Amino acid sequence: MAAGTVCFYLVEGQMEEKAVKILKGNYILSGKVSVLHQRKISNTLLRLIPRKSKVIIVFDTDAADTEHTLYENLNMLQRENIETVLIPQVNNFEDEIIYATSIKNIKELLNSKSNSDFKSDFLKEKNCLKKLEDKDFDIYKFWSRTADKSSSFSKYENRSNKIKKL
C-alpha cells in the first residue's frame, strides 16, 4: 500500500464492524470502520473519507435487491478518484465464519443457544479473536470467495487479498 494511504472500511452491519476491529492489526490492514446497512454513501460520509484512501466495501451477496445501491456507491467513489476494494460475503457473515473455521454450524463458535442468538452473542463477546482462532480460523479462507455465477453480485471481483496481511 502506498505511503500515506488510509484504509476506510464500509461494512454491512455491526457484526462485520466488530470483525474488522478484531482482525485489523493481526490479519488485515488497520483502518477506520463505518456501518452502511446497505444504504447509499451520504455526502457527509463521503467528506469524511480522506483523499488518499483505500475504501474497502464488505457486502452480503444474499440480498439481490441491494446490488443497485452497491453499484451507485462504487460510481460515487470512482467519481471522487477513491480506490475501492470489494469484498463479497458469500452469502453472509455467518457463512463466511463457517467457511473459514472448523465449525459446521454458526452457534458452535460461541456455544450460542440458537443460530438467531449468535448475532447478539458475537457482539457481546469480549474474546472473539481467541474464539475464532480456537476453531482454526483461516484468514486465507475468510472473505475469499466470489458470488455464485447466477448472482447479480458475480460481476464484482473479490479483492480481499489487497487488505490481508498474508
What are the functions of these language-model segments?
Residues 41:
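Nucleic-acid-processing active sites and adjacent nucleic-acid-binding tracks
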Residues 13, 61:
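Residues immediately flanking
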Residues 8-12:
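Short hydrophobic beta-strand that contains or immediately precedes a catalytic carboxylate
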Residues 34-35:
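A short, aromatic/hydrophobic, helix- or strand-capping loop or linear motif
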Residues 2-3, 17-31, 44-56, 63-166:
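C-terminal accessory helical subdomains adjacent to catalytic cores in phosphodiester-
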